[in-house]
Design a protein with these regions (language model features):
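Enzymes that bind and transform nitrogen-containing heteroaromatic metabolites
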Residues: 2-153
Length: 153
């Protein structure tokens, strides 16, 4: 499951964060996976990001409207969230990447290998990311926060 989150970074527009859980081999974890249940329910997982959101983006959200909203003076501190957990929402992730709307990615890396499934970061626009912060939890899950440093042409 992946989540998208806008936050006010103190700049002239809202920032967008992608929040996702993925396996070591890059696939979306199954919803009934024990470690995924922790990510979805623990206050150090997705609930933290839900508490800090105002609006929710869904698949088929008009990205051109989002571009305008992001630069609007009245929306500088608005917080939007979207969960990316299926093929439709993966398309939203790809669209956000295509328009370079992602400023930060928070990845919950689950210490399991599925071998097959829905890839989280397949077909995204090439870009470079810097590690901002990492946290490892007692259950083996590692949260890695990446910040976008540039678009690769």
């Amino acid at each position: 499951m992946t989540t998208l989150f806008f936050t006010d970074g103190g700049n002239d527009m809202a920032k967008i964060q992608i929040i996702t859980a993925m396996t070591l081999d890059g696939f979306l974890p199954k919803a009934d996976e024990n470690l995924m249940q922790w990510v979805m329910n623990d206050d150090k997982g997705f609930p933290y990001w839900h508490e800090h959101s105002i609006y929710r983006l869904m698949p088929h959200y008009p990205l051109l409207d989002l571009l305008a909203e992001r630069h609007s003076d009245k929306n500088k501190s608005d917080i939007y969230i979207a969960e990316i957990s299926d093929t439709q929402s993966i398309e939203l992730l790809r669209g956000l990447s295509r328009y370079n709307l992602i400023d930060e990615m928070v990845v919950y890396l689950l210490p399991i290998v599925l071998g097959k499934g829905t890839p989280v970061f397949d077909d995204l626009t090439p870009s470079r990311w810097n590690v901002h912060k990492t946290t490892t939890f007692p259950n083996g899950i590692t949260r890695i926060i990446y910040r976008n440093s540039c678009i690769l042409q």
